[in-house]
């Protein structure tokens, strides 16, 4: 039997989380708002002053090259400057985007996947992408509520996150160091933490969310391919 406080918590949770069909009806992703992907990219650049400056420099250099292409000395200087400015722009974009990959953002994405259990290509990914866009904007992590252009990019990001964290964990697994010390160390002195292999992350909290989300996604992919090829009877 639930206590009054538990009933209140359930009601509050229900109020805080609208029903799925209402969320789906109000979901508008950047692909629905912008005419094209390039107009979306230009909008994102225009909303961020550092990126805007780094973007305008190559544009100005291209214009200067068209005006001074007959003067060899100036042309060489401008071309070198253009190449360097493009490299700086790419580094700036990479650094700017990588700032969003903090623990809070990753756990929020994993919680969305665990809660909604999205099917492969399912509408749940639209809701997840929308919620993540709002989360990043509301917390000041991203300058617009348009981080994920569409649900497919959100899904692709999630899969790359699982793959990347898994490979990083294998490279930094404590068992690598433990194997080198076990020959000179009694078995009783080797702690359980020392020989425990990490599947995704050495952070136990992040590890738990990653494992659960990966299991849900694996089940969704298995179900998707089972429906695609029903004649193959898999266990």
Swiss-Prot record:
Effect of inactivating the gene: No sensitivity to killer toxin K28, a protein-toxin encoded by the M28 virus that uses S.cerevisiae as a host. Cells lacking all 10 proteins of the DUP240 multigene family show no obvious alterations in mating, sporulation and cell growth.
GO cellular component: fungal-type vacuole membrane; nuclear envelope; nuclear membrane; plasma membrane
Highest taxon of the lineage: Eukaryota
Keywords: Cell membrane, Isopeptide bond, Membrane, Nucleus, Transmembrane, Transmembrane helix, Ubl conjugation
Presence of the UniProt keyword Repeat in the record: no
Location in or out of the cell: Nucleus membrane; Cell membrane
Sequence position, cross-link Glycyl lysine isopeptide (Lys-Gly) (interchain with G-Cter in ubiquitin): 11, 218
Main subcellular location: nucleus
Topology within the bilayer: Multi-pass membrane protein
InterPro entries registered for this protein in UniProt: DUP/COS
Membrane-crossing segments per the record: 51-71, 73-93
Location of the region described as Disordered in the Swiss-Prot/TrEMBL record: 169-189
Residue stretches of biased makeup (Polar residues): 169-186
Pfam families, sorted: DUP
Role of this protein: Does not confer resistance to killer toxin K28, a protein-toxin encoded by the M28 virus that uses S.cerevisiae as a host.
Subunit structure: Interacts with ULP1.
Miscellaneous: Present with 1695 molecules/cell in log phase SD medium.
Family: Belongs to the DUP/COS family.
Record's protein name: ULP1-interacting protein 3
Source species of the chain: Saccharomyces cerevisiae (strain ATCC 204508 / S288c) (Baker's yeast)
Gene this protein is translated from: UIP3
């Amino acid at each position: 039997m639930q206590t009054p406080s538990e009933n209140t918590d359930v009601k509050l949770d229900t109020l805080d989380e609208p029903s799925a069909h209402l969320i789906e009806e109000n979901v508008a992703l950047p692909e629905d708002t912008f005419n094209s992907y390039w107009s979306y990219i230009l909008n994102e650049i225009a909303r961020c002053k550092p990126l805007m400056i780094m973007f305008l420099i190559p544009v100005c250099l291209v214009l200067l090259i068209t005006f001074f292409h007959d003067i060899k000395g100036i042309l060489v200087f401008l071309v070198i400057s253009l190449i360097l400015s493009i490299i700086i722009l790419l580094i700036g974009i990479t650094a700017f985007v990588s700032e969003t990959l903090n623990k809070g953002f990753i756990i929020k994405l994993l919680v969305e996947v665990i809660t909604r259990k999205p099917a492969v290509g399912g509408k749940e990914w639209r809701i997840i992408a929308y919620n993540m866009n709002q989360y990043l904007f509301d917390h000041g992590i991203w300058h617009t509520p348009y981080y994920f252009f569409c649900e497919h990019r959100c899904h692709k990001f999630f899969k790359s996150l699982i793959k990347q964290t898994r490979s990083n964990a294998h490279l930094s697994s404590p068992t690598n160091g433990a194997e080198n010390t076990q020959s000179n160390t009694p078995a009783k002195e080797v702690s359980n933490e020392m020989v425990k292999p990490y599947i995704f992350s050495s952070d136990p909290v992040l590890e738990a969310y990653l494992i659960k989300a990966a299991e849900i996604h694996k089940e969704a992919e298995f179900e998707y391919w089972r429906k695609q090829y029903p004649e193959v009877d898999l266990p």
